């Protein structure tokens, strides 16, 4: 059975508008939506919260044009030449570097190139492998990451003469023991060198070109295994922008002011920035999630929508008294991405902020970020929303058969013009060969479709296949144990992974962060026993933790707040329970 969008959701246009690169596509549509308004009434596309810097559409257009000319001059790209090279971008998660990064990528797209978005939270070894799989023509780094970028090149098989550039500015206090970067060419130097050159015309894409020309190479999150690289074409991301944008357009009565902190080297941040630009909304950028900074920013900017991840939503719900100290009346909705928001966490946040609409979604890097979003007029706790325009879903059960109805659980397979075809192990140029036949991508997520009381069908995510724990031949979803543990007042945060067991094959093991306000006189050993009783007395035998509970100070997370279960699995290799 194939599940598609509800009837009230607008259809995806056919054919897709693929005549421009994605940056120009978003800017053209934005101007069509708000360009006729008085300048002072036009929503500001991007606002840099830390330094109070606004980027208008004109400023962005001018900067993109200047950088396009500068890069063409530096690399001897002739006017009208379609370039196919790949450029690596290693940018820190700090303030206006967000916009510098985005503008740089749009300039590279105008030349025909693709951008390899490296994550600074990756190891040198991981990044070296990435630039070996996608050999870049050049690399751009932020000032604080010059040494990391140089070490990455040295660790890789790439030439030490690889053109290496730095972003011109650093925001915030200078780093201690900062390296000397005076011999590294800057963006400002490129701009100065090319200022008298003729402008470069915008790149127009021929029919079929958008489906094979790569815009971004992104790494998968690596939360459950090794990082992999996927190629995102202009068609992929334009389809995803339209899917999210058309759906959001029917749910928003006025322009929104959104708060975003997810970095642009991650697909969630990339898609959010592009979609909000396309919609004509304003985006307030923070360097990361600092609770006090965000709470102060909301009344100052009159933020209407928060783009968050579930761990941060949980952190806010645990700090209700802190939230009460600020005027948060402008906020109407919270978009939860980067992972499913379970019904218990949903309920906690609704108790703290009953007037906020909590809107969860589902997607992944391989689906170019999004496949479903919550419908504000029919929100359901634990739901990941409804299927978006142009998306088709089907589920395959453990026997390998397609499910034939509602409430049947299976691995989700997705078909959509936004879906990426394969992982990239060897890319010599920013072009791929698109599939010509119908393509269904297995997602690795286990889910089901449920018809809710409204009659609207919703997607519910059960767990990741690779995170499922096989106990005595039965599949155990870690999320079910995590949800139950979070019901206890002692648990601030938790993550459950599988550990080898000689008899059962695997057994669940829980990492737990103690809630600071809970009974400080209770020892870790006593707390483990309390949580064991709480869990094992309520759940079936295959879900029991027994003495497999580890109390920790922190749980490793990716830059966008996802729990890194692969790191947790490494920590419990050869683990034995404490003797108590």
UniProtKB/Swiss-Prot annotation:
Keyword annotations: ATP-binding, Ligase, Nucleotide-binding, Virulence
Pfam families noted in UniProt: AMP-binding, AMP-binding_C
Residues given in the record as substrate binding sites: 264-265, 562
Transmembrane segments: none
Keyword Cell inner membrane found: no
A single GO molecular function term of this UniProt record: ATP binding
EC number: 6.3.2.-
InterPro entries attached to this UniProt entry: AMP-bd_C, AMP-bd_C_sf, AMP-dep_synth/lig_dom, ANL_N_sf
Role this protein plays: AMP-dependent ligase; part of the gene cluster that mediates the biosynthesis of verlamelin, a lipopeptide that exhibits antifungal activity against plant pathogenic fungi. Verlamelin is a cyclic hexadepsipeptide and is bridged by ester bonding between a 5-hydroxytetradecanoic acid moiety and a carboxyl group on the terminal Val of amide-bonded tetradecanoyl-hexapeptide D-allo-Thr-D-Ala-L-Pro-L-Gln-D-Tyr-L-Val. VlmA and vlmB are altogether regarded as essential components in the biosynthesis of 5-hydroxytetradecanoic acid.
The protein's name: AMP-dependent ligase vlmC
